[in-house]
């Protein structure tokens, strides 16, 4: 009897060891997948809803949190991003009583990636409006980060009756020729990934080689979408310089003082173009300020949204 029990325990221990080894090998080969799985688990454990809706015949994924009957905020991510990019900021708004919707733009995250779509900011703005229509959101407080800010500007300009307040986080949209290599948003080598991180963060940490490889692999799967979006933006046909002064709703401009993608001077230009805008600068923060500097930013965003 004891011999049988020992054999059973040995078999169980061996199974555990094998599972740990397989899991460890999986993590080394696909760390991005493990990180995504952790994020999805975090969403489930914190009551964040993950849903899809049909917009113009496409499946658009979105996250939602906060009380169902609360005032609505829609947050739009940037180039190469997804709904999870708002994971640090959205809880501030949700805890303050807002219903926060975070769509994955077409071609990003868990939304469809149709080959025939242009992925221009103008057409993505149409997807955002279609998303609002599909959910029956007549008027929202709209926020956008980086390229998502440009998209939010277009929505606010073309549909001002749908936007009660506008929040722009390190936003694109002005006619400015970048002084950095736009190909870095689709890195193919660890060195290029390092260059991208220097642009995104004031003090980037070294990325382990196995993580860098998987990040490059993951970006590569949707790299054609990013390239198409960048090519469209570089034409400058959808810039908003001449239209921003037309905005009448309250506007909050949020910027990291160390943003190397869109330097602080662009925030100041945007502030001048929108007379009623409020500019909040966060010292020491870079282009990823909504993700990395949320402790300082969150309360100010909530205060603006509540006014």
Put a short name on every predicted segment.
Residues 29-34, 184-248:
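Conserved alpha/beta-hydrolase catalytic His-Asp/Glu region
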Residues 277-307:
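Catalytic active-site module of serine/aspartate enzymes centered on a nucleophile-bearing elbow/loop
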Residues 65-110:
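Conserved HGGG/HGGXW glycine-rich cap/lid loop of the alpha/beta-hydrolase fold
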Residues 53-58, 63, 95, 101-143:
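Active-site loop/oxyanion-hole signature of alpha/beta-hydrolase fold enzymes
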Residues 17-52:
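An N-terminal hydrophobic leader/cap segment in hydrolases
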Residues 247, 253-255, 259:
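Short beta-strand/loop motif that positions the catalytic acidic residue
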Residues 150-158, 163-194:
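Flexible "cap/lid" loop of the alpha/beta hydrolase fold
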Residues 260-266:
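Conserved alpha/beta-hydrolase "acid-adjacent" motif
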């Amino acid at each position: 009897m004891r011999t049988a029990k020992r054999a059973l325990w040995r078999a169980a221990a061996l199974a555990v060891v094998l599972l740990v080894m397989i899991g460890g090998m999986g993590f080394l080969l696909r760390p991005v997948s493990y990180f995504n799985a952790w994020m999805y688990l975090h969403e489930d454990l914190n009551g964040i809803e993950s849903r899809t809706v049909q917009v113009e015949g496409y499946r658009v994924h979105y996250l939602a949190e906060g009380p169902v009957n609360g005032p609505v905020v829609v947050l739009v991510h940037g180039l190469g991003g997804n709904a999870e990019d708002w994971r640090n900021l959205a809880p501030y708004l949700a805890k303050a009583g807002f219903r926060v919707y975070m769509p994955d733009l077409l071609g990003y995250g868990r939304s469809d990636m149709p080959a025939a779509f242009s992925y221009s900011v103008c057409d993505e703005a149409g997807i955002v409006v279609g998303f609002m229509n599909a959910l029956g959101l007549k008027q929202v407080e709209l926020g956008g980060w980086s390229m998502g800010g440009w998209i939010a500007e277009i929505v606010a300009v073309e549909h001002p009756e749908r936007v009660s307040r506008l929040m722009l986080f390190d936003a694109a949209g002005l006619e400015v020729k970048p002084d950095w290599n736009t190909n870095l948003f689709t890195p193919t080598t660890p060195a290029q990934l390092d260059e991208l991180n220097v642009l995104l963060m004031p003090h980037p940490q070294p990325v382990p080689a196995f993580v860098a490889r998987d990040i490059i692999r993951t970006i590569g799967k949707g790299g054609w979408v990013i390239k198409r979006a960048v090519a469209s933006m570089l034409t400058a046909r959808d810039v908003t310089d001449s239209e921003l002064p037309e905005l009448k709703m309250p506007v909050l401009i949020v910027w990291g003082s160390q943003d190397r993608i869109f330097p602080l001077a662009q925030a100041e230009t945007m502030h001048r173009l929108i007379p009623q805008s409020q500019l909040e600068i966060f010292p020491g923060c870079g282009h990823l300020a909504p993700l990395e500097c949320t402790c300082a930013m969150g309360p100010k965003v909530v205060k603006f949204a509540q006014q």
